[in-house]
Amino acid sequence: MLLIKNGRVMDPKSGLDQVCDVLVQDGKIIKIASEITEEGAETIDATGLVVAPGLVDIHVHFREPGQTHKEDIHTGALAAAAGGFTTVVMMANTSPTISDVETLQAVLQSAAKEKINVKTVATITKNFNGKNLTDFKALLEAGAVGFSDDGIPLESSKIVKEAMEEAKKLNTFISLHEEDPGLNGVLGFNENIAREHFHICGATGVAEYAMMARDVMIAYATKAHVHIQHLSKEESVKVVEFAQGLGAEVTAEVAPQHFSKTEALLLTQGSNAKMNPPLRLESDRRAVIEGLKSGVITVIATDHAPHHVDEKNVEDITKAPSGMTGLETSLSLSLTYLVEAGELSLMELLEKMTYNPAKLYNFEAGYLAENGPADITIFDAKADRFVDSHFASKAANSPFIGETLKGQVKYTICKGQIVYQA
């Protein structure tokens, strides 16, 4: 038995927000009350700390199989636990891609060994070829939770329509990475800084929001659910809002980096600040925050994208891979740039990091209730935290190293077990 005493218990599902005790047994929460005494229970003193549902991240890259020099499922799960996450959804752009039942089963076997809940999508098209759909039905039955070709946009509108129709038939959805290659230059650099500082043609805003406009309208026509991944532009928020206003089933996520920083970070952090989509303008940063506040964007997801130090430290920054490690800084960035900045209440933030992402996939997660799962994150929302280069992840490609942020995870509890302790 585990007894959590005197914490500020916050549950976005029920709206519970009060100082009380939580008793855990056999992977479940068995009691939430103002005062619980339990002889012999292991006790955590959570005085002054927030006791929240375990965080849920629906967009991570754990690089297994095929790229385990960057990360693997085990180190990814450790990074998740250190960041307060108890449930994550891996993307399928591995080597080989997760496009068939055999590869999926091997990945899920590896995931099952971890102390947190590690789930995965499968690809929309076979080996990312953009032309032939995978066997959605067989992959769902084998344990995939959804479908995404994240990393590579789907250029064929015909395939997008077919994928949406198939997903709708099976009561699932597809998640899309929106960057039209035909409208884009060098990825990872926003068009403004690319032109002015790097003297190259960079990643354009129109490549994101034009492709999104196509796909949300196909979703509208097919009455299918589409989830837009890591949007970054002011116009993109408007596109989602427009589609939702029409009655289309469109959901969207934003990554912490896109509401925290702008393209200028490339000048001080170099390749660690290079990502797809890129960091944008201050007007875009403000717009995605407004999208979170209005409810147009319902989910915060990291797009945790670890890379080996040698891959990032190349002479020509345009040759460095895009992406940053995100699981261990997500909560702190969100507390700093949303809650401390007065943009969202702590409860509103937690909803976008726990209940909403869990609800999207119908996971039994993201809430605190008696008889519910004992997936719990305990953190100090006010603590100052200096981000150093020591991560649980294999990778340290974070542009936030050296920054002081708000918020420190103290305990992560999954299935009733302490899986991380600061």
Curated annotation (Swiss-Prot):
Its cofactor is Zn(2+). Zn(2+) 2 binds at residues 150, 177, 230. GO terms for molecular function: allantoinase activity; dihydroorotase activity; zinc ion binding. The keyword Chaperone does not apply. Pathway: Pyrimidine metabolism; UMP biosynthesis via de novo pathway; (S)-dihydroorotate from bicarbonate: step 3/3. Zn(2+) 1 binds at residues 59, 61, 150, 303. Pfam families: Amidohydro_1 (PF01979). Keywords: Hydrolase, Metal-binding, Pyrimidine biosynthesis, Zinc. CDD domains: DHOase_IIa. Its EC number is 3.5.2.3. Binds 2 Zn(2+) ions per subunit. One of its GO terms (biological process) is purine nucleobase catabolic process. The active site is at residue 303. Substrate binds at residues 61-63, 93, 276, 307. It comes from the Bacteria. Gene3D superfamilies: Metal-dependent hydrolases (3.20.20.140). InterPro entries: Amidohydro-rel, DHOase, DHOase/Allantoinase_Hydrolase, Dihydroorotase_CS, Metal-dep_hydrolase_composite, Metal_Hydrolase. It is an enzyme of class 3 (hydrolase). GO terms for cellular component: cytoplasm. Catalyzes the reversible cyclization of carbamoyl aspartate to dihydroorotate. Belongs to the metallo-dependent hydrolases superfamily. DHOase family. Class I DHOase subfamily. NCBIfam families: PRK09357.1-4 (NF006839), pyrC_multi (TIGR00857). This is Dihydroorotase. It comes from Streptococcus pneumoniae serotype 4 (strain ATCC BAA-334 / TIGR4). The gene is pyrC.
